[in-house]
Amino acid sequence: MKIDGTRSNDRATEVVLDYYAAFNRGDWEAMLVLLDEGVVHDLNQGARETGKAAFARFLARMEASYREQLHDIVVMTSPDGNRAAAEYVVHGTYLASDPGLPEARGQSYVLPGGAFFEIHDGRIHRVTNYYNLEDWIAQVR
């Protein structure tokens, strides 16, 4: 979906929607293009990772263990376009066991989630993801 792009918050909305469209296609390169070199990635209930290379490794880990699609994406932005938030519903399949988590057996799950973004000059500088890990674990046990 294209927005007129004349206002900062419209451009920020477009960046976030492009990011999630690339995610849903499994197009990791298109996701990486939208990130600043020093992107900060706050993993849900986990560590903070910094840099595009770290984000690429995260995507490789995700691809190995999960197949996910995000539905019902809603994006909200600040008037200056420097911050954005997204809410969505994750529809996924747990393909291969992720260390420290229950054993994967091809379980399906549906889980609400959200993210916060910092965006400058059309690039994502920070993405912080949230979902209810206990809910996810209960669904895949």
Regions found by a protein language model. Name each.
Residues M1-R141:
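C-terminal and inter-domain tail/linker signature
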